[in-house]
Amino acid sequence: MVLGADKGFQGAMPYSHDILTAMIGMLPPQSIFCVSAIGPAQLPATTQAILLGGHVRVGLEDNNYYSKGQLATNEQLVARTVRIIKELNLEPASPNEARDMLGLKHPARMAG
């Protein structure tokens, strides 16, 4: 689910708590879902998705700011999301766990 792109894409959905809750409510039981939100919607949408058992995508592709007027780095955006996950007594997926969830092959180990 991508939310918050309504200013740039015709037919896109804005982010609101109610919209995300409704979209998740329409999924089949036991669905695995991921939420990505654009711009200022990124922090509230990803936090809500985590609380509702979803997966998230964060980074500069979707949001250039850490807070109002403060440019972000990918590292800052990822670190904040990891902090939120851990504050909720959850554990973020490792790169290999994420690959497994997505059905991706693990990179070849380098010799040496």
Feature names for model-found ranges:
Residues 1-61, 71-72, 76, 91:
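Catalytic alpha/beta core domains of metabolic enzymes, predominantly
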Residues 65-67:
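Short beta-alpha connecting loops at secondary-structure transitions
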Residues 78-81:
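Phosphate-binding loop/pocket of nucleotide- and phosphate-handling active sites
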Residues 83-112:
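Mid-to-C-terminal alpha-helical segments outside catalytic/metal-binding sites
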